[in-house]
Amino acid sequence: MNDQTQFTERALTILTLAQKLASDHQHPQLQPIHILAAFIETPEDGSVPYLQNLIEKGRYDYDLFKKVVNRNLVRIPQQQPAPAEITPSYALGKVLQDAAKIQKQQKDSFIAQDHILFALFNDSSIQQIFKEAQVDIEAIKQQALELRGNTRIDSRGADTNTPLEYLSKYAIDMTEQARQGKLDPVIGREEEIRSTIRVLARRIKSNPCLIGEPGIGKTAIIEGVAQRIIDDDVPTILQGAKLFSLDLAALTAGAKYKGDFEERFKGVLKEIEESKTLIVLFIDEIHMLMGNGKDDAANILKPALSRGQLKVIGATTNNEYRSIVEKDGAFERRFQKIEVAEPSVRQTVAILRGLQPKYEIHHGVRILDSALVTAAQLAKRYLPYRRLPDSALDLVDISCAGVAVARDSKPEELDSKERQLQLIQVEIKALERDEDADSTTKDRLKLARQKEASLQEELEPLRQRYNEEKHGHEELTQAKKKLDELENKALDAERRYDTATAADLRYFAIPDIKKQIEKLEDQVAEEERRAGANSMIQNVVDSDTISETAARLTGIPVKKLSESENEKLIHMERDLSSEVVGQMDAIKAVSNAVRLSRSGLANPRQPASFLFLGLSGSGKTELAKKVAGFLFNDEDMMIRVDCSELSEKYAVSKLLGTTAGYVGYDEGGFLTNQLQYKPYSVLLFDEVEKAHPDVLTVMLQMLDDGRITSGQGKTIDCSNCIVIMTSNLGAEFINSQQGSKIQESTKNLVMGAVRQHFRPEFLNRISSIVIFNKLSRKAIHKIVDIRLKEIEERFEQNDKHYKLNLTQEAKDFLAKYGYSDDMGARPLNRLIQNEILNKLALRILKNEIKDKETVNVVLKKGKSRDENVPEEAEECLEVLPNHEATIGADTLGDDDNEDSMEIDDDLD
């Protein structure tokens, strides 16, 4: 064999591997086929074999070629025992001589792997193998010449398996992915794609930079550019170009020594500059290149950008561009900004429709068009902190995944019976092992076998039905995948002007598979129609599925809102008045505002806002809670701000977050953080008159435009809130009037007090100012019933099952002493606790009342312990025992305490 120093490292590796193959197969001589077999072995670094790269570039079947080579390799006679030394054959010597001649002709310093390959092509046995594998040698030669380009082999390490070694490692060829149909179709965004292409066609500074919020589709625009390049729908300067996406993670990974990262990056740039084909480099998150001083990759990029030797597309968000890229003026001016806006709901629906087949094929489900419309609408309404179309795509993807997982899992009916059968079979095995069994065991075994046979009989039709339904869906999915592959092949053939292949696919293969899909769809539809509600497999994603997904992600019962919202809103007053008693004017005002908003007649940018005025304990805060519970089925969907905590000037920062430079800047404010993730909420400002005037100033833009700006500069949308403010201003005028209904004169006095305290611009922005009535005796009786019902519900939540039964006299007692002019109905809760719950606790501990029993409460003569019951009343409530006490109680009473105190005084 020739001197080893004449070969490059890769060529020498191939020769060494060929010797090993000959030794492993016990062949006496090293022949050209061993060299060819070494070419198809995967290198130690895991890269694609050189010959595989050439064959696949020529669009030949590499797997078939590999089989032909291995088949010819095993046909060579073996020598037993294996030879001690393997000698090269005459044919191999001729190959190496030809390789040396080719090296000299190309004026290279070393024999490279392509020299050896070209020499192999001259061997008749190798030519026969290529012919058998249906691979054209001339086409492979042409691919090898394109791969080499103008590169000279002037060092032993200059050989490469790929034309663009650095780019193949640290970048992704997006044009190749588009050619193979691996990219999703880009719907819309024509203007942004055209703008990007216009900038790329410039003579200098041909570097667009896409700027927009995360999730609006910046990368999709680049995919659209790649698609247009392979379709030749670009200016002449870009025709035949390649678009690579730089993988910054791969570029950085493993660069442990100083200079490794820079060397890799410069290698990428050098390959782009030296390439005969125009290469456009896309750098996502381009602000990541900006670093510190000499280690900054942006500084390596600047010279190439300034000389116009490089076309780069950047993408970043508004915040990163402003805070990082703009600070380096020299880097920024080399790029032309292209603003990318968030698509509208209508545009998002169009995007979803374009991607619908991809998601149907991936998940094997059927997506209804109504599901796509619902996804776009719900994503816009309930996920405002995310951006379209990303949020809508997530809703569709999660819903499809949920349906696919449920489909691939066994139905509950089938799974339950199979588990029963498994348990019976285990029991049978255990009974069969008992050889000396008595008659009882034998009877049990007989019964178990009968039950097993019965379950098998029940399971057989269930399994058959399940397998038939599942097979139909799987077959349909496979047919759709096949259609997608054929469409991509047809497009590729049309691009290569391979009219024969394109015609065969367009007029024969594709119509056939479409007919098959139609037939399968009819079969599946017929099976679903026949099964009806008893279908074992659910394979459809509809609007309800999307609503359930949105409800899980947001915590808002979206499904219920969308189904029965109209009926709920019509009867809103009836439902709220059963919870909040005696305040019909306030309930009507809130109900009208909610109906106006939901029907789309209200100002979409202005939230419904209310100022509730009235006595303490009249139900202002309670109404806010019930509105949240009514709209969202959860009273926790209310954001409560106690304005008594906001009486200082600096309290504004509690709501909005501190400004830059202050401690806690990154944490944000209480109000802005809550509204960002709960945009559909009831926002309660309790006791708003106690807030500092600057807090009210901040609320002006929220009440007028439905937005507030956080300390970090983010605009928070408040347009979907219901803003409720409560105040006790003018309470003395309400308290002094006769009767429960607010009189016109009292209303004027209260409004006068309100105007004295709040500025006109604040009051003018409020949708409705409502004055709450004084609670009448009739209203107090209703409140008593509501509170007792709430206590029973609280028992259930604590896993206690007591039923309260109060006599009418006992309820009258609670209504009489549970209300005061100063505190409204607030004393009622304390009265119930002192007169009923405390006494009930003692009865329970003494086992006089047990779980799931009725608690009887009566009025009796005696002294009450509640401060709201005057001493001269001489009446209180008594909880009657249902059983005799099993635990003795302390007999020392209140009277005994007082007597003992008097004795102590006498002794003193």
Curated annotation (Swiss-Prot):
Q: Where located?
A: Cytoplasm; Nucleus
Q: Where is this region: NBD2?
A: 541-731
Reported impact of K778A: In NLS17KA; fails to concentrate in the nucleus
The chain residues annotated with the modification Phosphothreonine are T499
Q: What does the record say about induction?
A: By heat stress dependent on the heat shock transcription factor HSF1 and the general stress transcription factors MSN2 and MSN4. Expressed at a higher level in respiring cells than in fermenting cells. Expressed in stationary phase cells and spores (at protein level).
Q: Which residues are annotated as modified residue N-acetylmethionine in the UniProt record? A: M1
- Keywords for this protein: Acetylation, ATP-binding, Chaperone, Coiled coil, Cytoplasm, Isopeptide bond, Nucleotide-binding, Nucleus, Phosphoprotein, Repeat, Stress response, Ubl conjugation
Q: Where is this region: Repeat 1?
A: 7-76
Note the Pfam families from the entry: AAA, AAA_2, AAA_lid_9, Clp_N, ClpB_D2-small
Q: What is the effect of changing E687Q?
A: In HSP104(TRAP); completely abolishes ATP hydrolysis, but does not affect nucleotide binding, thus keeping HSP104 in an ATP-bound state
Q: Where is this region: Repeat 2?
A: 88-150
Q: Name one GO biological process term.
A: cellular response to heat
Quote the annotated effect of L462R: Impairs prion propagation, but does not affect thermotolerance
Q: What is the effect of changing D704N?
A: Impairs prion propagation, but does not affect thermotolerance
- InterPro entries with a match to the protein in the record: AAA+_ATPase, ATPase_AAA_core, Clp_ATPase_C, Clp_N_dom_sf, Clp_R_dom, ClpA/B, ClpA/B_CS1, ClpA/B_CS2
Span(s) of short sequence motif Nuclear localization signal = 773-789
Region NBD1: list its residue ranges: 167-411
**Residues engaged in binding ATP 2:** G614, L615, S616, G617, S618, G619, K620, T621
**What PROSITE patterns does the entry give?**
CLP_R, CLPAB_1, CLPAB_2
Provide the family line: Belongs to the ClpA/ClpB family.
Comment field (misc): Present with 32800 molecules/cell in log phase SD medium.
User: What does its UniProt record remark on the domains?
Assistant: Has 2 AAA ATPase type nucleotide-binding domains (NBDs) per monomer, a low-affinity, high-turnover site (NBD1) and a high-affinity site (NBD2) with a 300-fold slower rate of hydrolysis. There is allosteric regulation between the 2 sites. ATP binding to NBD1 triggers binding of polypeptides and stimulates ATP hydrolysis at NBD2. Nucleotide binding to NBD2 is crucial for oligomerization. The C-terminal extension is involved in oligomerization.
Protein name stated in the entry: Heat shock protein 104
Q: What is the source species?
A: Saccharomyces cerevisiae (strain ATCC 204508 / S288c) (Baker's yeast)
**Name of the gene this protein is made from:** HSP104
